Amino acid sequence: MSSLESARADLALLILYLNKAEARDKICRAIQYGSKFVSNGQPGPAQNVDKSTSLARKVFRLFKFVNDLHALISPPAKGTPLPLILLGKSKNALLSTFLFLDQIVWAGRTGIYKNKERAEFLSKIAFYCFLGSNTCTSIIEVAELQRLSKSMKKLEKELKHQELLKNEQYQMKLQKCNERRLALIKSSLDIVVAIGLLQLAPKKVTPRVTGAFGFASSLIACYQLLPAPAKSK
């Protein structure tokens, strides 16, 4: 493949990536929290970028609550323990509520919804839902990692080291394990972000800390949305 063809292929992947509304939202989120880190809650250009980007992001999330509402009423995967099913449904319910309330907050900040006090109150409830959903996600990921670890250890006992490298089932479990570790890190970062936005620990979780954690979790989200690499034949 020539350098021109390689560049065209890379650009095609970039276009495919940027065509995703979710990807654009996460890029804007990285800009938002990066600006929050720079501003540290102080007035100035960085804080203006933080506020304007936050408002712009809400447009990307219009009717996004339907996704988690659908997941809430969908049957769980076979073999999933009941506690994990309940945690998963709680996560879906909380995230769906957060995204729904976020639309009212957007309407309040754009002047469509006139009751500003009610909009700010709903904004606080929305952030509590965001905190709850990420807490559920963290617990789920820890439990799923334990389940994966047990099944991987069982395979390790049955197969030799060289066979493990070639075993497709083991490699799939290893990939899932890495994905879940990354999801656990992201949800843990977002818990700190939610605590910062709710000002539950203002002395420890300052706007700069919130910005740093939010920026890191946004970069992880951007990475998670990258197209899967093509398998070599």
Curated annotation (Swiss-Prot):
One of its GO terms (cellular component) is peroxisomal membrane. This is Peroxisomal membrane protein 11-5. GO terms for biological process: peroxisome fission; regulation of peroxisome size. Expressed in seedlings, roots, shoots, leaf sheaths, flag leaf, panicles, spikelets, and endosperm. Residues 1-92 are cytoplasmic. Keywords: Membrane, Peroxisome, Peroxisome biogenesis, Transmembrane, Transmembrane helix. The lineage of its organism: Eukaryota, Viridiplantae, Streptophyta, Embryophyta, Tracheophyta. It is found in: Peroxisome membrane. The chain crosses the membrane at residues 93-113, 207-226. It is a multi-pass membrane protein. Its main location: membrane. Belongs to the peroxin-11 family. Involved in peroxisomal proliferation. Pfam families: PEX11. Induction: By abscisic acid, H(2)O(2) and salt stress. Down-regulated by nitrogen or phosphorous deprivation. PANTHER family: PEROXISOMAL BIOGENESIS FACTOR 11 (PTHR12652), PEROXISOMAL MEMBRANE PROTEIN 11C-RELATED (PTHR12652:SF10).
